[in-house]
């Protein structure tokens, strides 16, 4: 899903950078009240785990690549603000250190993976968790990765610098990730269900509406 440099027109890349900068800035502002000695270790553990999972990539014809994303899981476990920051760290390190995704295109990758994936996943989980928590986690994981792929497909499809037309990018990128999203949804649901049962104090969505503060000890 990472967009290399040369795939986006300057205007499209600039719009992605603007959207990413505004959202990440708001996340930093809100995270100040959440990030402390209890949540900092968890933030690092989640980011490291997702970083490792994202290193597995499968090429997609007519697009970039398909891989596990993990933003929905980060949003559910850490909350939207810390989830955005965790995924921002993952995507930025991948681009700057490992060359996974371009530097100019970093704004697009951040918007798709660190913004859309986290916020859509978190929002859908909140919407459906009263019906069935594990099912809500599955829906969040599947829909978040599919919609993130759609954002990437639209970005490169609207760019004249990219060789394929928007119909091709949307069909192949979104379709490929919709299939992969089934696996991501299942993993998100499975890991969430286990953690929520074993260590509910780790899960942001378990205490966000209560007056209790999380007591996180890793």
Swiss-Prot record:
It holds the Pfam family CbiM. The gene is cbiM. InterPro entries: CbiM/NikMN. May be involved in metal transport. It comes from Haloquadratum walsbyi (strain DSM 16790 / HBSQ001). The lineage of its organism: Archaea, Methanobacteriati, Methanobacteriota, Stenosarchaea group, Halobacteria. It is a multi-pass membrane protein. Keywords: Cell membrane, Membrane, Transmembrane, Transmembrane helix, Transport. Belongs to the CbiM family. NikM subfamily. This is Putative metal transport protein HQ_3621A. GO terms for biological process: transition metal ion transport. GO terms for cellular component: plasma membrane. It is found in: Cell membrane. The chain crosses the membrane at residues 7-27, 42-62, 73-93, 101-121, 138-158, 178-198.
